[in-house]
A protein has these predicted regions:
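Interfacial helix-loop-helix linkers and transmembrane-helix boundary segments
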Residues: 34, 49-58
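Transmembrane alpha-helix interface motif
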Residues: 2-48, 156-299
Length: 299
């Protein structure tokens, strides 16, 4: 069964990612960071499989650890001194924990952007913004598909060059460098020519002209309306929680969090449901499909 959020209206999918990424960047409470990272990681595994998630974790984990290490090296605020650096500056617990929180935030945002590139395809970007900002929408659609297409072309060209005896992994170091540069030059030239051809093709078809109409298969149905209402509720509820201080967590000069009350727990619960909304949509779609299949009489 296909991912349910991918089959929703592009405006609904875009609104969900805009909301969840904004919350992932703004809410630095440890509970929110854990929920956002787990939700983004699960969705990446749902879209790309476990192998795809592991491939992204190979560079996300070092990035998070680097952020955690750099922050206490340059920021020395905090009242809990753990040790003193060779420079004489204090190493504080608060700066270390804030570095870990910043690394978790960057990892969560990166995971959600991986999901964006898989769900919000180039045709959806053109559909959403083609009439309002046609030039920018075309540029965004080309950017979204540039990296995956560049990687595929890089692999294809490298394989073709390998069959011609120009392998980038065997031979003398100088020869491998020349082969790698040749492969990179071919792929860059290919990508630039493709981008120019796409721009010329869209211009010849009248893209961006006033009054131009376009054909689309997207229809806003009742399911999209229900998801949009759910996103509006989550956004307003979390906004109220942020203004009320229920999602606030202070790192400097000392660790300080608001009191744990049923209201603050409800804020975290709503945020967790927001991060795992794709799970809920898939579960509801699966139950509806099984119920419909079970109620259909056999021939």
């Amino acid at each position: 069964m296909d991912d349910t959020l991918r089959t929703c209206h592009p405006a609904v999918s875009f609104a969900y990612f805009a909301l969840v990424i904004a919350c992932a960047m703004l809410l630095m409470h440890p509970v929110c960071l854990v929920l956002s990272t787990l939700g983004g990681g699960w969705y990446v595994a749902r879209l790309l499989g476990g192998k795809g998630l592991r491939r992204h974790l190979l560079w996300l984990l070092p990035m998070a650890l680097l952020a955690a290490a750099l922050n206490p090296a340059f920021v020395h605020q905090g009242v809990t001194i753990l040790a003193y650096l060779p420079s004489g500056n204090p190493l504080t617990l608060e700066s270390l924990l804030y570095g870990l929180a910043a690394g978790a935030m960057l990892s969560a945002v990166a995971l959600w952007f991986v999901c964006v590139t898989d769900v919000i395809t180039s045709d959806k970007v053109v559909y959403l913004f083609g009439r309002v900002i046609p030039a920018l929408s075309l540029l965004l659609s080309m950017i979204l598909r540039f990296v995956p297409r560049f990687v595929r072309r890089l692999r294809a060209v490298a394989q073709a060059q390998r069959h011609l005896g120009r392998d980038t992994q065997t031979g003398a170091p100088a020869r491998r460098v020349r082969s790698a540069l040749r492969v990179f030059s071919i792929v860059v030239t290919w990508s630039l020519e493709s981008g120019l051809s796409t721009a010329d093709s869209m211009r010849c078809r009248g893209y961006g002209l006033p009054g131009r109409t376009s054909f689309s298969l997207y229809r806003f149905d009742r399911r999209d309306g229900a998801v949009a209402l759910w996103l509006a509720f989550c956004g307003l509820y979390l906004l109220g929680g942020g203004l009320a201080g229920g999602l606030r967590f202070q790192y400097y000069p000392m660790l300080l969090s608001g009191p744990v009350t049923p209201l603050t727990v409800s804020f975290f619960a709503v945020y967790g449901l927001l991060c795992f909304t794709p799970v809920l949509l898939d579960s509801l779609s699966r139950r509806r499909y099984l119920a419909r299949k079970g109620g259909t009489p056999r021939a």
